[in-house]
Amino acid sequence: MTDPPYPVPRGWLDRYGWAIVRERVTSLVEESRSRIAFLCGSAENEADVRDLFDLIVCLVIDEDTLRHRLATRTTNAFGRHPEELAAALKWNPLMRAIYEGHGATLIDASKPLTDVVDDVVSVADAVREPRGDA
């Protein structure tokens, strides 16, 4: 599955989901050994690749901000259709609970974008700092 149809037909999101291909993520890891790389999103089988990451970050957002951002973004139409919006609102608290359970670093994504980016880069840089084993 790459992208869902737009708008998604009724019940489509209940029947289909996103899956991640381990080989592609492994390739990304190999290609980015000397720099920070980010893989954004979630997939139903993400446990299959979790071991490849040094850090997992969960961007946490309140429902009102999520609604506003989905309605006003220009880079992706997902969330404007009522069924997509309902799915996003349902997934939002579930994702936080799942990632929190995996020890993810939680970042308040309801802040302005530049602040969120600074927070993500800051925690990523902290993981990259030499640990004395060089």
Residue positions per predicted region:
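NTP-dependent small-molecule kinase module
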Residues: 96-134
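A glycine- and Lys/Arg-enriched "phosphate-lid" helix/loop adjacent to the NTP-binding pocket
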Residues: 50-98, 102-105, 128
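Short glycine-rich anion-binding loops that position phosphate/pyrophosphate groups of nucleotides
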Residues: 43-45, 62-63
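Short, hinge-like loop/turn segments at secondary-structure boundaries
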Residues: 5-14, 56-58, 75-76, 125
